[in-house]
Amino acid sequence: YMHEVVDAVTQGNKDGILEQKPTLVNLQCDIDHPTQAMADMLHIIHEFGGVENLKGKKIAMSWAYSPSYGKPLSVPQGVIGLMTRFGMDVVLAHPEGYEVFPEVEAVAAENAKKSGGSFTKTNSMAEAFKDADIVYPKSWAPFAAMEKRTELYGNGDFEGIKELEKELLAQNAQHKDWACTEELMATTKDGKALYLHCLPADITGVSCEEGEVDASVFDRYRDPLYKEASYKPYIIAAMIFLAKFADPADILKKLEEKGTPRIFE
């Protein structure tokens, strides 16, 4: 759909109907969440002191239990697709049956091969967290189930949708032990892995009875999480800026040389 919109506005600009070609920014789709993944990456770069320090760092992108079974796959897919480009050791962890798009896994594997990193999968949250530098525990819906739901909606089979929802809730409830606990965090690199989340997180004992993360873990990383979230508007602005100029680096250099005050009082 987004590609169709881009084609339409491009044609409108070419035909003189639109004076300018609008920039389309993907704020989230079924496949990817680029603004979130890049905000995550910018946060990681800041925390580890530069992009040159990311090679060999282990990041665990792990499924985690949430009372809501139908969360998008775009965040884990965006993360494994981007982080593998920087030579990181990316581990995708989830219970059996919670696979992501196979096409995205293929992209992640190819990226890791090119960057000198690695991309591995496991059905053990503990294995993923062990000695990890970064952890990203988050719930998502099974890809196969979302395909089935789309088919049912397309056929107008609302009874089938109700039955599928019951099945998914039952499947989801079997994995309440997939949670980011203090015990799991203690197994990470020096017990101090960077905890990431796209927010809002399902916090055990706060927003739900049982959720993705222990309240004590979330509270300890609350300030870094808000910093992580704060990067997103700048990521979006950068995307628009890059789309508007042929040589954005030159534009930024000229703005710096001009010395125009950035803060007006």
Regions found by a protein language model. Give the residues of each.
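Phosphate/diphosphate ligand-binding glycine-rich loop within oxidoreductases
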Residues: Y1-I45, I203
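Short, conserved loop/helix-junction motifs that constitute active-site signature segments
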Residues: L18, N53-K55, T84, E183-K192, ...
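Glycine-rich phosphate/diphosphate-binding loop of Rossmann-like nucleotide-binding domains
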Residues: I45-E151, N155-E159
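Adenosine-phosphate binding glycine-rich loop
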Residues: T188-E265
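ADP-ribose/adenylate-binding Rossmann-like module
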Residues: A145-E209
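A short helix-to-beta-strand connector/capping loop
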Residues: L18-P22, E110-T120, G191, R220-R222
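General beta-strand structural signal in soluble alpha/beta enzymes
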Residues: T23-L27, H33, A39, M61, ...
